[in-house]
Each structure stands twice: as structure tokens, then as C-alpha cells.
From Swiss-Prot:
Keywords: Chlorophyll, Chloroplast, Chromophore, Membrane, Photosynthesis, Photosystem II, Plastid, Thylakoid, Transmembrane, Transmembrane helix. This is Photosystem II CP47 reaction center protein. It is found in: Plastid, Chloroplast thylakoid membrane. Gene3D superfamilies: Photosystem II CP47 reaction center protein. Belongs to the PsbB/PsbC family. PsbB subfamily. InterPro entries: PS_antenna-like (IPR000932), PS_II_antenna-like_sf (IPR036001), PSII_PsbB (IPR017486). GO terms for cellular component: chloroplast thylakoid membrane; photosystem II.
Length: 508
């Protein structure tokens, strides 16, 4: 047939049996990739430290998606929350991976069967005997079934009525666990950070899908609409399906990048806006302030800050700090976090507390500037020492640590003070192991960043695909010069004007 690579899909254009076969094979590939990727991630994942080396620091991509749907245990005897388990059951991480691979194999066999047995009676119109699909009826069937699945997920899986529930956490990603969720039917259900909205929206959308599916199964489209939207053409199905997919891809790119109840920070890492707004820093200071109000010392108040909360307040966990083309996990960038050194408090020789100005997200380097409580610059690490007025040496800056491994330790020698001032630009200070993975010290993005970039890119690509195929199906007669209602068999190339026997070509 000699088709160029970008035209090969025409072979299934008028062949419903093999069109079904290639779609089943596509499902086999998707499910097979998911299962294989899960097994690979399980082979390299280290579950030993869920606080300082969580899945998102290790670059896990499919494990977070399994976890948010209620999978927490492994046949290896470990739990994602750090404990050990004796009876993980069939729906463990390995169980889900295995079921996807098994499903992939069955789809592979089904695809081969449908490719071989393509000429089934169900695909032919009994009136004409030609291959034919009742596309509006198929649309109704698919809408009904997807509505049923959507309703079932919201009403049973998410609510825990028949299923585990979903991953739910507090606003600071500290207490996450899988638990049943009650539907939120009030206005709070529209808050993207309220898990109850996931249940209620799936129930509502599923109900709508079931009713719409039944409608399309029982009501035929008007003839004008059928012809106007080219409902008899399979390319119309392709175009509208691409539209649904790119719309969904844009939505999930948004919920992932900006954060929502569906993308918990314990599973996918923090968002860049939490660094930009000092989200975790404010909560840490609030907790310290509450401790001081209870007559705790600074050391006691800072020692009560969870290491997990302090770790979120570190720029290396900001997904926007990794370049788009820096491959690898966060751990292979700045290293594996080993421990929190504590919170450094800087003071000048007059006893004023100084605060290091933090590095904004899109800077690679940033001047080290220390300001007092009123925002007045009191010290810095100058670029040109000859003209310096606020250098650490001149101002007499010292640093003392509260909480963490260096609790109670203070330094006054300028070199050490400057070292910790530079590190304080990046948020809370952590000891990082760069030797184990040969980490190069260059920040990487988290799975949150990769997911967003991938889905936004493919959404844009699919948007153009929708326009392309929509235009092809709506203007097929214009592009091809063929009347879409032409029923007679015509021989391409026999006439100068297609289908007009008065313009028969002369044999050369």
C-alpha cells in the first residue's frame, strides 16, 4: 500500500474490527507500562525513611498514584508510613502491579483475536451488508458505563463503603493516611482542598453520566444535527475524544501544579507557591510562638517542630527549582537528607535578631542579606570587600542553633557564620548525603513538576490534534472533493472529476 508513516492509521478507518483491535492493543501497552513501571519503582524504592526520604524525593511516579487511591502496604513487609506489615493482602503495591500486567496480557491476546477475526457480523449493517458502526448508540453505551464507574468510585471506593477510601492529610502534610471520606454536598465541596468534594463530585458526575448515557441510548439525534456534526464519521469520534482528553490533561496539570486534595504534598511533594508564600515558615513560627507563650524556652519550642514540617520549608523541595531537562530524582540533585541541623538565629553585636532574606524561586544565586525585624539591612556578605559596610566581620554577626542536631550550639567565627547564612537562604538547614547516589548538587524537580510539564505539553499537542481532526471531519467534502452523502462506489483516478463519467481519462 506504501503509506507514509503519518497516514498509516487510514488502514483502520473503515475497518471497525481492526479499529477495536488496535485500541485494545493500546490499552495493553498502557496497562503493561503501568505495571512494569510499578515493579521497577518498587525495586529501587527505599521505604526506610518516610520523613526525610519520601517517595517524591526518590523520584517515584506511579507509587504516589497507587497510594492516593488507598494502597499503602507491600508484599516486602513494609508500609508507606514507615511501619511493618504481616498480611498486606492481594491489593498491595505488587498486587496492583501484577494485576496491571495480567490485564495487559489479556488485552494483548484480545487484540490479536480481534485483528484476526475482524469481519464480525456485529460490525456490518444488516441492510447494506457493509461495515458500519452505530456511533451515537456506542456513545450512549460508553457514557453509561463510564458514568457507572464514576458513580461507583465516588459512592463506594472514596467513601469506604466498599473500598479503602483515599489519602487524606492536614494542610501541612504531616498526618496523612488512607481513610474513608464523606461526600461534601455544601458549598465547601467546591473547595479544591476539601477531600469530600472528590466523593460528591464523582457521585454527581456519575449520576449525570448514567442519565446522559440512557438518554443517548433511547433518543436518536436529529437528522440535521447528525449530518451537521458528521456523526456518521469515525473521525468525528476521534476529534471529540481528543478534546475530552486534552481538557482533562489541562485540568490535572492545574490541580497538580497549584495543589489540591487530589495531589497531597506527602505523595507528590510541596508546590512552588508554598515556598513563594512562606507557607511552612509561617506555620513553624506560629508553633514556636505558641510554645513561647506556654513559657517554653526557645530551644524547647524549636525542638518540638516536626522534622517533616521543617523539611518542607527547604527550597530543594520546591518543584520549580529543578530545570525541565535535568533528569533524575531530587535525591540525585542535592542529595539524600539525613537530618535537620536546627534553626539558625543570627544576632549582631548589639543583640538584634537578624533574618536571612530567602532566595526567590527563579534565582540560581542570590545576595546574602540579613535584615532586622523592621526589614532594615544590618549585615551582608559583600561582593566587594573594599567598599563593604555591613560585612559579617564588621557587624559582628553570630549564629546559634535551636532544635535539630546542633541544638544549643553557637558560632562566632565569620567563616562559619557566613556558611550558615548562605545555607539559611535556602530555608531550614539539613545535612545532605551526596556520596551515596553521587549527587551533583544541582536541584531537580519532583514528580509534581514532571507530571505538570508532561500533561501541559501533551494537552497543547492534543488541542492542535482536536482542531486538525475536527476540521478534517467537518470539511471533508471540501478537502477531498467528495460529497459526504455520495453512496455510489467510485473509482479513484478513472475520471478527471471524481465520479463524473463524462470526464473519463484517456489511456496513455
Amino acid at each position: 500500500m506504501g503509506l507514509p508513516w503519518y497516514r498509516v492509521h487510514t488502514v483502520v478507518l473503515n475497518d471497525p474490527g481492526r479499529l477495536l483491535a488496535v485500541h485494545i492493543m493500546h490499552t495493553a501497552l498502557v496497562a503493561g507500562w503501568a505495571g512494569s513501571m510499578a515493579l521497577y519503582e518498587l525495586a529501587v524504592f527505599d521505604p526506610s525513611d518516610p520523613v526525610l526520604d519520601p517517595m517524591w524525593r526518590q523520584g517515584m511516579f506511579v507509587i504516589p498514584f497507587m497510594t492516593r487511591l488507598g494502597i499503602t502496604n507491600s508484599w516486602g513487609g513494609w508500609s508507606i508510613t514507615g511501619g511493618t506489615v504481616t498480611n498486606p493482602g492481594i491489593w498491595s503495591y505488587e498486587g496492583v502491579a501484577g494485576s496491571h500486567i495480567l490485564f495487559s496480557g489479556l488485552c494483548f491476546l484480545a487484540a490479536i483475536w480481534h485483528w484476526v477475526y475482524w469481519d464480525l457480523a456485529i460490525f456490518s449493517d444488516e441492510r447494506t451488508g457493509k461495515p458500519s458502526l452505530d456511533l451515537p448508540k456506542i456513545f450512549g453505551i460508553h457514557l453509561f458505563l463510564s458514568g457507572l464507574a464514576c458513580f461507583g468510585f465516588g459512592a463506594f471506593h472514596v467513601t469506604g463503603l466498599y473500598g479503602p477510601g483515599i489519602w487524606v492529610s492536614d494542610p501541612y502534610g504531616l498526618t496523612g493516611e488512607v481513610q474513608p471520606v464523606n461526600p461534601a454536598w455544601g458549598v465547601e465541596g467546591f473547595d479544591p482542598f476539601v477531600p469530600g468534594g472528590i466523593a460528591s463530585h464523582h457521585i454527581a458526575a456519575g449520576t449525570l453520566g448514567i442519565l446522559a448515557g440512557l438518554f443517548h441510548l433511547s433518543v436518536r439525534p436529529p437528522q440535521r444535527l447528525y449530518k451537521g456534526l458528521r456523526m456518521g464519521n469515525i473521525e468525528t469520534v476521534l476529534s471529540s475524544s481528543i478534546a475530552a482528553v486534552f481538557f482533562a490533561a489541562f485540568v490535572v496539570a492545574g490541580t497538580m501544579w497549584y495543589g489540591s486534595a487530589t495531589t497531597p504534598i506527602e505523595l507528590f511533594g510541596p508546590t512552588r507557591y508554598q515556598w513563594d508564600q512562606g507557607y511552612f515558615q509561617q506555620e513553624i513560627y506560629r508553633r514556636v510562638g505558641a510554645g513561647l507563650a506556654k513559657n517554653q524556652s526557645l530551644s524547647e519550642a524549636w525542638s518540638k517542630i516536626p522534622e517533616k514540617l521543617a523539611f518542607y520549608d527547604y527550597i530543594g523541595n520546591n518543584p520549580a527549582k529543578g530545570g525541565l531537562f535535568r533528569a533524575g530524582s531530587m535525591d540525585s540533585g542535592d542529595g539524600i537528607a539525613v537530618g535537620w541541623l536546627g534553626h539558625p538565629i543570627f544576632r549582631d553585636k548589639e543583640g538584634r535578631e537578624l533574618f536571612v532574606r530567602r532566595m526567590p524561586t527563579f534565582f540560581e544565586t542570590f545576595p546574602v542579606v540579613l535584615v532586622d525585624g523592621d526589614g532594615i539591612v544590618r549585615a551582608d556578605v559583600p561582593f566587594r570587600r573594599a567598599e563593604s559596610k555591613y560585612s559579617v566581620e564588621q557587624v559582628g554577626v553570630t549564629v546559634e542553633f535551636y532544635g535539630g542536631e546542633l541544638n544549643g550550639v553557637s558560632y562566632s567565627d565569620p567563616a562559619t557564620v557566613k556558611k550558615y547564612a548562605r545555607r539559611a537562604q535556602l530555608g531550614e538547614i539539613f545535612e545532605l548525603d551526596r556520596a551515596t547516589l553521587k549527587s551533583d548538587g544541582v536541584f531537580r524537580s519532583s514528580p509534581r513538576g514532571w507530571f505538570t510539564f508532561g500533561h501541559a505539553s501533551f494537552a497543547l499537542l492534543f488541542f492542535f490534534g482536536h482542531i486538525w481532526h475536527g476540521a478534517r471531519t467537518l470539511f471533508r467534502d471540501v478537502f477531498a472533493g467528495i460529497d459526504p452523502d455520495l453512496d455510489t462506489q467510485v473509482e479513484f483516478g478513472a475520471f478527471q472529476k471524481l465520479g463524473d463519467p463524462t470526464t473519463r481519462r484517456q489511456a496513455v
